[in-house]
Structure formats: C-alpha cells, structure tokens
Amino acid sequence: MTVALKLITVVAEEVVAPKIAEDMMRLGASGYTMVEAHGQGSRGKRLGRVGELNLRIDAVVSEAVAEKIMARLSAHYFPRFATIAWLGDVSVLRGDKYV
C-alpha cells in the first residue's frame, strides 16, 4: 500500500534556493515544496529579515535521485552558501506520483 522513498530537506539562503530547486527537478525530483525557514544555528539566528531569509525545500524522491541531489549540493552549494541538507526515510501513499 505504501512505497518506501526518501525525503530530502534542504535549508538554504533565499538567493540560492530557487537554483537548488531547479537542480533538484533536473536531477529527477518530480516536484518540491518551498517555504520560509526561521531558526538559529552555526551561522547565527535567521529571523527572516530582508537579505537574510532562509528557505526550506522538501522533495520526496527515490534513493538514486536523493544521492544525485546530495552530491550536487556537496559539490556546488555547501562550499559557497549557508546551506544544509538531510535525508529521511518515508513511506508514501500514491508513490507513483514521486517516481
């Protein structure tokens, strides 16, 4: 009834988040959700003021697509931008929408 997939979550600076979402689609994601993200971490507190807004991008993908996306993030975004990403296992109804 459910399909085992990966949830990839990326939190990135507003300036680069749309490009990351574009890369995710190009690498095989069938869609994504992007919302404002507020919080605090190693680079200080992000309150969502102009110029310091972070966006959270979520996509449900296959393991193979998740690996491609993580490799792209590691090579092209982590060295230059305040960006973080993580993967989680998810069980999805209507899994055909994601693969």
Set out the residue ranges of the language-model regions.
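Positively charged, small/polar-rich N-terminal and surface patches that mediate targeting and assembly
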Residues: M1-V99
